[in-house]
UniProtKB/Swiss-Prot annotation:
Pfam families: Methyltransf_7. Belongs to the methyltransferase superfamily. Type-7 methyltransferase family. SUPFAM superfamilies: S-adenosyl-L-methionine-dependent methyltransferases (SSF53335). S-adenosyl-L-homocysteine binds at Y19, C63, N68, D104, S133, F134. The keyword S-adenosyl-L-methionine applies. InterPro entries: MeTrfase_7, MeTrfase_capping, SAM-dependent_MTases_sf. Its cofactor is Mg(2+). GO terms for molecular function: metal ion binding; methyltransferase activity. Its EC number is 2.1.1.-. One of its GO terms (biological process) is methylation. It is an enzyme of class 2 (transferase). Homodimer. This is Probable S-adenosylmethionine-dependent methyltransferase At5g38100.
Amino acid sequence: MSTSSHMYPMSSGHDQHSYIHNSSYQKAAISSAVEKTRRCIFEKLDLQLSSDFGTFRIADFGCSIGPNTFHVAQSIIDTVKSKRLEESTENSLVPLEFQVFFNDQPTNDFNTLFRTQPLSPEREYFSVGVPGSFYGRVLPRNSIHIGHTSYTTHWLSKVPDNVCDKKSMAWNKNYIQCNNLLEEVTKAYKVQFIKDMEIFLDARAEELVPGGLMIVIGECLPDGVSLYETWQGYVMDTIGDCLMDMAKSGITSEEKIDLFSLPVYFPQFSELKGEIEKNGSFTIELMETTSHPLEGKPLTNDFITSTFRAFLTTIIEKHFGDGVVDELFYRLAKKLSNHPIDFEMRKKQVVYCIVLKRK
């Protein structure tokens, strides 16, 4: 199976299982970084970059469907307006317009995205939908002043070669993800991550104006920690166990499971840092990790099941067919109830906040 993340957006629509209603975990991390990114914009961005044309352009890469992307856009706009007001004299304020590019895969539910965006005059910007993989350029050269992406770059452009090949040393047998248990599998995923991150950074370097900022927020593993040791890794492995149980019940087949692996890789922080430093197009203005804001708070089984369902439904339906998702996540909820996650014992992923400046 050659699985490309380009084909599998978050759950669409507006029902109880859609991403629009199950993205509060991501929102908490994004919100926790607002003050840091605001400070970087104030200290590192030269507003003269937009003075020639009177339009300030922002892009959210991998926007999915609201509301997180709209909060991001408005937060950046509010910060730029405050900085501009602070730096301008009474008679020097020239009207500045804002344009926001919402980018995601062509299969993203752009209809729901734009139906749920704030209406004018509350919305202070002109909206543009940009379908296309961010693993490559999606916008003209030197066109963006601030780029943003959050909870996206753990999605690879495709499943690494040989991971679903039974004859390969990198065959991900018995697992549906790179949980760092199998060395050859981890190597294959890391190679793909390195390729994709290079392409991502090179594309953003072309799209950003010199002096423009790129904000990157997401989760990674602390150095020395493997994904299977975290609660997120445990949930993903449990989903794999549920699929195997369903194969034994005849609902799906072991053959389909053997040919299934997610195009997802959570790097260790040093891996992520190394790839960014290796790219010569940016200076690093901020690179920090913190614990997730919800760490230490009780996450219910319903919350966990709904969160994972929102980002896995499309890819699971595509590979295993209709009628599998409801049963799969019913079984997941049951397993989590019978075998509760020991959050205290599990190692933690960390949230990273990175701000890069285009040279």
